[in-house]
């Protein structure tokens, strides 16, 4: 008993050393991360963040401090607000009417989009008639044997003739007699 006690204690020591290594690595990592974070009590923290965001040479900015919007897009959006804007229907309609007429003429001359629809409809009618004929035939039995009845979809077992004869010759049960009697 004492020998097994010593081996289990040795295993515990090995495990604890392994666990201590993991704990030490995580605590050193956490300590380095917490030391890199700005402390809340100082006033210089927010100004440092702003300087880091505006500094073009700053390459060590953490991902939480990077701006989400590009500086160029900010400047272009401000200039867009200052410029005059037009509504789409303020343009003169003469150019659009001509374009619409040209498109209508092209659509009238283009029969390529109609041909597949006609052929698709005719083939679908033929295929549905064809499948109906074959579906009727597929319900008929294809192979007969003494004990099995095979169709295209499944194999059904047919009981032997002796079992069928027994069911015909059995006297009616009491339950069936009581339910069929009328007063």
Swiss-Prot record:
Keywords: Cytoplasm, Isopeptide bond, Ubl conjugation. It comes from the Eukaryota. Residues 170-183 have a biased composition (Polar residues). It comes from Saccharomyces cerevisiae (strain ATCC 204508 / S288c). GO terms for cellular component: cytoplasm. Residues 99-108 have a biased composition (Low complexity). There is a cross-link at residue 21 (Glycyl lysine isopeptide (Lys-Gly) (interchain with G-Cter in ubiquitin)). Its main location: cytoplasm. This is Uncharacterized protein YKR045C. Residues 24-111, 160-183 are annotated as: Disordered. It is found in: Cytoplasm.
